[in-house]
Amino acid sequence: MVSQAKQPSNATFKNREKPQEVRKANIIAARAVADAIRTSLGPKGMDKMIKTSRGDIIISNDGHTILKQMAILHPVAKMLVEVSGAQDVEAGDGTTSVVIMTGALLGAAEKLLNKGIHPTIIAESFQRAAERSVEILLNMSTKISLDDKEALVRAASTSLSSKIVSQHSSFLAPLAVDCVLSIASHDSTNVDLNDIRLIKKVGGTIDDTEMVNGVVLTQNAVKTAGGPTRIEKARIGLIQFQISPPKPDTENNIVVNDYRQMDKILKEERAYLLNICKKIKKAKCNVLLIQKSILRDAVNDLALHFLSKLGIMVVRDIERDEVEFLSKSLGCKPISDVELFTEDRLGSADVVEEVESDGSNIVTITGVKTTNKNPTVSVVIRGANNMVLDETERSLHDALCVIRCLVKERALIAGGGAPEIEVSYRLMKEARTMEGVEAFVWQEYAEALEVIPTTLAENAGLNSLNVVTELRLRHENGESNSGISVRRSGTSNTYEDHILQPVLVSTSAIRLASECVKSILRIDDITFSR
């Protein structure tokens, strides 16, 4: 009897264990990241202290800031950092919520995988549940107008309530609203936050933070040659060339034999500098902003002497990345060569002066006359030390982003976990009318959304089981705005308690979390390239 030829083994394709193990490892890694920042959610959330590789200390409870600084090695865990970053760009707030939600949805997916449901079916059902969730959120939101300043301030206050600076929210929230409204028009659908410049100065307290309608420079006016420190009806020039004698190449040397030649060099130098200064004065410029130079002195003492004699105020060492903002704000064009220094390239302002505030000097440019449609504002942030300043800047940025969200999508919803419980209740109700696997998946998705109110209650020291059960009951009775009020240490109508957030924060978080989970579930192997 002829022995049968041995068939090639198909076991490699039948190995179902590996994809399951990979998925399990991915879910564990992602959930570990979510659990790490879970304690920093909400007004009673804790802060994290981070020591960077350079030895700097950061204290923050902003989800994106914490994750960005964490040394994360697992590639799937890095996806959560990117999701947090995407939420920061899209909405500016809710960066912690989106990561916690992703972790909870992955936990739900793990339960479903253990029941033997295919990952693609889970991912697609999650996506459909997310779309339905967004519809529910938009239906329960309340439309607002940009004229309703009180509603805007309340939304900004809710964002600030979880930060270190929460006790200053009564002062910082209106400041954030004023900043955004001063650069946004009624028909605008977006706000470029680059038009709001945040400047940090150590000294004073957070209450000394102020908004300046105009431009603030951290550099001081040059006083060494007795130049002016206040100019009215200013004509401002922004230059990128140097007002100092040109240097020879490194290989070349100049040999001077006698003093007459030395005299000639000095005379030449004086004539060269005087010629530049006269051209600047001829263009009717009386305030000169000089960009920092690496090659040689941006402006030397002799040039400063000539400029002060001509009554021109000089501010030097303007950073390269400030040039674009200054030219946009002041309406002046950067000038790269003295031959191009003409009157039409200058900007105009009512007053440019150096003022002393809380022990340090700043230069303020107010009453800017520009043809630019988009005005700009500056905010000088004050604080006791750099850590406080950095966290105040991050908190203020979050508040500005919340107002920007309301310019994009002019609708508010209740905060304190109310929208998540409402969406969870509605999805659960709809899941009961479905058939097959989809019903299972929607139920798990709905349950996972309850992680936000559960975490809020845990962080506030409440009994999360009792609180969430009570909230479910209230929502079943039609109280769709019932959420957790930390001030009352229990449940209440958070909309009436003025705990508000833009609808865009919640819709964006649900969309991004569901997309991230979909990506993670579709991965069945990790290979490392050479």
Curated annotation (Swiss-Prot):
Q: Where is this region: Disordered?
A: 1-20
Fetch the InterPro entries from UniProt.
Chap_CCT_delta, Chaperone_TCP-1, Chaperonin_TCP-1_CS, Cpn60/GroEL/TCP-1, GroEL-like_apical_dom_sf, GROEL-like_equatorial_sf, TCP-1-like_intermed_sf, TCP-1_chaperonin
Q: Where are the transmembrane segments?
A: none
Where are stretches of biased composition, namely Polar residues? 1-13
Where does it live in the cell? Cytoplasm
Predominant location = cytoplasm
| Single Gene Ontology BP annotation | chaperone mediated protein folding independent of cofactor
Q: Which GO terms describe its cellular component?
A: chaperonin-containing T-complex
- What is a single molecular function from GO for this protein? ATP hydrolysis activity
Keywords attached to this Swiss-Prot or TrEMBL record, sorted alphabetically, are: ATP-binding, Chaperone, Cytoplasm, Nucleotide-binding
Database matches in Pfam families: Cpn60_TCP1
Q: How does this polypeptide assemble, per the annotation?
A: Heterooligomeric complex of about 850 to 900 kDa that forms two stacked rings, 12 to 16 nm in diameter.
Q: NCBIfam families from the xrefs?
A: chap_CCT_delta (TIGR02342), thermosome_alpha (NF041082), thermosome_beta (NF041083)
The similarity comment for this entry is: Belongs to the TCP-1 chaperonin family.
**Function, in words:** Molecular chaperone; assists the folding of proteins upon ATP hydrolysis. Known to play a role, in vitro, in the folding of actin and tubulin.
| Record-given protein name | T-complex protein 1 subunit delta
Q: What is the lineage of its organism?
A: Eukaryota, Fungi, Dikarya, Ascomycota, Saccharomycotina
**Name of the gene this protein is made from:** CCT4
